[in-house]
Amino acid sequence: MVLVQKSVAHPWMCDILGHMTTRHYVAMFDDSAYHMFYTVFGWTGSSDAENKIAWADVQHVIDYKAEVSVGDILEIDAKLTKIGNKSITILSEMKNLGNNEIAATLKCICVLFDLNTRKSVKISEELREQASKYLIETNNNE
């Protein structure tokens, strides 16, 4: 897995029950995706000078496993679990460093997206080769 995010659960991220509200899990996972795309493909939001392609999330499955409270220190690690014709699947794990528990996981399917046609496009052999270096296949239960 690749370390893609370090965060803290600030008080303003927490609800009246004192734990981090779901909107901030999504934000942290979303930020971590940029780091994963950079690690795997060297891609940043501004790296395509001609503004032709980008990655678009088309499915998120989040499993909230343990409560995150105010002040908890978090890390997100990610791995590429599948390379399809037009999509990749990334599995991310948010760990609470204070108790060493997995707080949440995200399975995300991302398609390569043509910004002009607004449709998914086939992953090139060059991108496939780059991605294959980070592919960690998992069992079907993940």
Name every feature range the model reports, one short phrase each:
Residues M1-I73, T81-E142:
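Terminal targeting signals and extreme-terminal segments of soluble enzymes
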